[in-house]
Amino acid sequence: MTEHFRLSFNARRILATLRARGPRSRAEIARLLDITPSTVTRLTGALIEDGLLGEAADPAREGQKGFPAKLLTIEPGGVITAGVYIDPDRIMTCLSDLAGRVLSEETLPVPDRSFVAMMTVAGDSVSHQVEALGYARRRLAGCGVSYPGQYSEDPTRVMRIRQFKDWPSVNVARDLSPYFGMPVYHMNDAKAACLAELYHGACIGVRNFCHIWLSYGIGGAAVVDQRPYLGRNNGAAEWGGLFPKTQPRPSGQDLLDTLGAAGLPLDKLSDIEDRHLTLPVVAAWRERAAAQLQWLCLVIARTYAPEAIIIGGTLNPLIIEGFLETIRAAPQLGEDYVTTPPRILRAARDNRPQLGAAALPIHQLMNPTAYAGQAVKGL
């Protein structure tokens, strides 16, 4: 993060509160966060000066006598972030603001699947969009980059998926930044997509939820008290490990392999069209995969007990919607599960997975859990 956006712990708490709860007065913020009104006034004054907050009249006090109370609001254009999503089929980039509004975007073909080629295309795309929109560099909080792969014991490295087998051993803290000319933050595709739902999508204000991401593989993420829970080595909620690759599993690659074994070889998930969905082999796969995902939802409900489970990904949308219909229609989530189950939600932002990556710099800026310094009273 640039020096301009090095925010204190309590400044982050103020931004996080306004994001989750909407416009609030200074007095309300002081009560909610248990900090002094003078501290709130000082911190919010600096945030307004930096362009991160704005003020609006309180409609509840309209027409009343005395000095009208002002509500603090997040200023969407105060910060611009870049997002890059890379999968074996395409490269998707965007610029977005604090409200998650996409200001510009591109979807680009994969030139070849080499690391250098894909990152070069992504970096050039981001650079062109920044120049075209004419934003001041001081407003760019950074670029988020996401691509598939489980985390290894080294948190700076993710395991290579089959389609990226020729990539070098990438150090995400070192090897991505040269392509983008700004601070770069990495998270794998599933966990970045979860941030898009947390900050801009179906789970704004949902305190505890889990995310299931269905692409070539099966990924996921967990959010506890509105904060991503990553666990040891960023390995929390990696649901794919519950479905061994030597066995049938509810993944996009498994569907492609199933089609190939039936004499219908397809190279990419984007090659699966609506007309394929009625084929008997696909119908059987969907039925089996839906049962597996219902079992996964039961495991999540028993272990995390979240308010909601959100399902999304890059599989054909009709396949994902079919999974949700099956799980929601089940009389019980599982045997002896007699309490109210978590809500099963459709992801709202998986059509723009690059927006999840663009949320990474916002997370670094706004979320108190990302604060690397020491919390000091009054700051």
Summary of predicted features, one role per range:
Residues 105-107, 114-118, 167-168, 172-190, ...:
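Glycine/GP-enriched mid-protein hinge/lid loop-to-helix segment characteristic of carbohydrate kinases
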